[in-house]
């Protein structure tokens, strides 16, 4: 096999013409491009099996069709973990499972682990750094077996369920250095399990030495273990992300939501 980053028809034709011995084509593709893969393969004349070797929600590089999710300073509005869950399940059911008789051998969900590269380090990854599983793991179990796990991950239904100073992420929140602010998240647990809250603030496009999500900036949040918090904005002008992880500690399940904001 060989792997393509998209299902570009001309690239597929080149493979057919120059590497006819390849018997399985692998395609890495993300929403919204996944639905077009089969048609592109057929248009190019590919008649052998194929695999979707990466799939997931819309990538950080694919935001032009959703301009409201690109903030004036370049920050990107991220889906909640529950919104991502819905995207993973829809992608598999509508574009992978249904094509098993059209040559699709299967798929690899991106990312089975936690993210260690990329523009936004919470964008992908079905596990957090503690090893807790996000709702997308539940969705994939359902996609693969027809049954959800006995215990489900916490739910943060939409981006409207995390607010900073009463505003949602798309409102392009700008605050002054050292200003006082507040935030809250609305989360539920399908099984009624107790939930814990873990808030953090990080500067945009920073990472730990291994490329993963860094520890939050200390000294800003009064108490980061509540569903409603008060915090001081960083003293340094720049762009930041406010992140909350909501955990069912007993069952090692987690949900997340993010609000970008700018200090000016």
Place the predicted regions along the sequence by residue.
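Aromatic- and acid-rich polysaccharide-binding/catalytic face
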Residues: 8-61, 65-68
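Substrate-binding clefts and catalytic carboxylate motifs of secreted carbohydrate-active enzymes
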Residues: 42-209, 224
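Exposed beta-strand face motif in extracellular beta-rich ectodomains
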Residues: 181, 238-242
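Surface-exposed, flexible coil segments in extracellular/virion-facing regions
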Residues: 203-231
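Short, surface-exposed loop/turn segments at beta-strand-coil junctions that are enriched for proline
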Residues: 232-238, 251
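Extracellular and select intracellular beta-sandwich modules with Ser/Thr-enriched
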Residues: 253-259
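Short beta-strand edge segments in extracellular beta-sheet folds
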Residues: 260-264
């Amino acid at each position: 096999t060989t792997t393509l980053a998209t299902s570009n028809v001309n690239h597929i034709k080149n493979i057919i013409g120059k590497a006819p011995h390849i018997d399985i084509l692998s395609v890495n593709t993300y929403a919204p491009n996944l639905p077009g893969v089969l048609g592109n393969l057929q248009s190019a004349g590919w008649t052998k099996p194929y695999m979707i070797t990466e799939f997931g929600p819309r990538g950080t590089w694919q935001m032009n069709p959703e301009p409201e999710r690109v903030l004036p300073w370049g920050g990107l509005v991220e889906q909640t973990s529950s919104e991502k869950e819905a995207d993973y399940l829809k992608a598999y059911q509508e574009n992978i499972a249904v094509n098993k008789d059209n040559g699709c051998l299967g798929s690899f969900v991106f990312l089975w682990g936690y993210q260690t590269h990329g523009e936004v380090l919470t964008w992908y990854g079905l596990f957090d750094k503690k090893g807790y599983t996000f709702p997308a793991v539940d969705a994939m179990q359902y996609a693969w077996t027809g049954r959800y796990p006995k215990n489900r991950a916490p739910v943060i239904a939409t981006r409207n369920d995390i607010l900073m100073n009463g505003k949602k992420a798309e409102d392009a929140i700008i605050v002054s250095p050292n200003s006082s602010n507040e935030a809250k998240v609305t989360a539920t647990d399908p099984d009624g399990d107790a939930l814990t809250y873990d808030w953090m603030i990080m500067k945009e496009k920073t990472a730990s030495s291994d490329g993963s999500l860094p520890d939050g900036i200390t000294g800003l949040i009064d108490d980061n273990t509540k569903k409603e918090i008060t915090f001081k904005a960083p003293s340094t002008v720049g762009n930041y992300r406010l992140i909350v992880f909501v955990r069912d500690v007993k069952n090692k399940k987690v949900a997340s939501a993010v609000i970008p904001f700018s200090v000016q």
